[in-house]
């Protein structure tokens, strides 16, 4: 997708935010609003942090400049025995037995990420021939090092980061400069949200709806939300945590936005459900709707691009915003 500056992207997000699509259905617990289309709150929480922390924008601009320099110099990899290990801490906050998902369901999410971020998922074979040469692999290995659990009376946490603080009924992050912290809880209308690199340590990490965490294909006896039961919501949000933007550039269909990646096609807007290929927008040869950074159902997203892989790896390079992860 054509490049624009991070400044322009943030300015556009200030006017568009992150789309939500929800409706109530009686077939699932009352406290989980039926999510008929994927939604994330990453841009919404970014806007709030930009308003609360005037220095964040300059830090993000510096990170973007570093990312471009690092990719251009082909110095994106910080490999140890061929991989970069990402220690993962899962902070599970639950009110009901249903929300208190099992260790096996949690491990299934780690297994999904280790496949998906390395193009080792079986469904990557479904990528259209137009994009097969663009399939990206990162060399990342996610390692579950700790599960923290806490019971709560809170019905739904929302996006105000309260779940990230013990004093507010949540769980404090575990050594965030060195670990990927994930908070799993009831988020109501949202599947999840995440922060881009540059945010303050105390709130850095990924937040996921408990029933969108893990994979039914790996562990069938878990608590899952239909259409979002293969672990791809976490792929999407961890992509944000590694500095990826939505593939359509959050431009509301104008074809003027960008995800700041060269090998993803210009795309007019987000895709939902399981669109038939090609879905053409912005005079492209077909949207890369199967990309994890789109909004399709879990079963219909199964790739990152090579350019996205480079962008993610850049955050771990020496001097990068996540260079201390795993160190």
PLM feature spans:
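Sec-dependent signal peptide recognition
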Residues: 2-9
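Metzincin-family zinc-dependent endopeptidase catalytic domain
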Residues: 111-273
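C-terminal motif of bacterial Sec signal peptides marking the signal peptidase cleavage site
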Residues: 14-17
